[in-house]
């Protein structure tokens, strides 16, 4: 098999949450331990940082990786989902794993793993951990796929655990209340390993404190001593006035990045105190070069050409509580939103947050889990939102561009898969 065929095999032969949802979820770590043992426990050959949370874990993971790279480390980065290329999930110093490595891994190891019937994420996690060991990384930043306690990444013992925040998402797996979801996320807390919690509320804080106490793990709540004192956008990026690091310029835009920055800088303080980050100036350099160093896409990402347009992967109620005000704050004659969602998200409550003073281009991403564009449009109309139907993200975006005046603003999002389809279509252009 070539690379394209190998990736199709991975998607078609293993249950993939991104494609089929709940049927891909495996409750337990037996397969993860079996794969780990088969490959000789590769994750024990380098240090790790474990990042969980409902929102913000991707931005936080990439920023920490960028800072560690600026500090001179060889850094593995494991995140999900990918937007355009499967290999975005597994990087070393920002460089994606070679296509040949993926092909060779499947060809050489399928006789072992096929009888296990692993999920897609179990297999890709094993692939990542093995690759990082062979690449002799110093440290790997590992993003949790779903939840924490039973996530297949939870076989590692990191030097720092990070929980960005908790909100209601993936309730079919993690529980329907904030304390239930917090219990699952708190499952990444390990004995004697410090943990940073970015955001907590009255319902979740005791859950984290109890787990940390049981594990004898120091716990630090970023909100108790905020590192970010003020933040605002500049033409060069997002500028932060901080308690311990002076003025920082971040290349990740979006108002929600202020919360992420608070979590990241609290985590950085722990890594500095442990000697993992050796040079404080690395924080400044890493902060301003996240996209260049790690290849992160889809976070309030400017799109080429005119009018002003951005895409963002925000996909749940908590995400839209931050995105909607920022969209409305954009100086524009009209706002045009290309919008679609997948069927495990709270469509009704997200609709309640969407800007009323906007024209919508309802669409659906190319995943079996997508809400049909007709259903999204129907829900939109019930909430006083109006627009047109389009069978694909690319067609919806083209329609928005055709309708837009030079001083309009276009937003593309509602799901990671909407952004993925958009970026893939833009790359296909000659």
Model segments located where?
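Extended acidic/charged loop-beta regions that coordinate divalent cations
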Residues: 81, 124-173, 206-247
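ATP-dependent carboxylate-amine ligase catalytic core
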Residues: 22-29, 33-45, 70-156, 172-174, ...
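C-terminal helical cap/extension that packs against the catalytic core
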Residues: 201-211, 215-220, 235-236, 308-311, ...
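Short internal beta-strands
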Residues: 78, 194-199, 337-339, 358-366
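Hydrophobic alpha-helical packing residues
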Residues: 64-69, 132, 380, 426
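Nucleotide phosphate-binding/pyrophosphate-handling subdomain across enzymes
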Residues: 139-144, 152-162, 166-170, 180, ...
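Short functional linear segments
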Residues: 1-53, 60-62, 66-71
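Beta-strand->loop->alpha-helix junctions that form or flank phosphate-binding loops
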Residues: 198-199, 211-233, 251-255, 278, ...
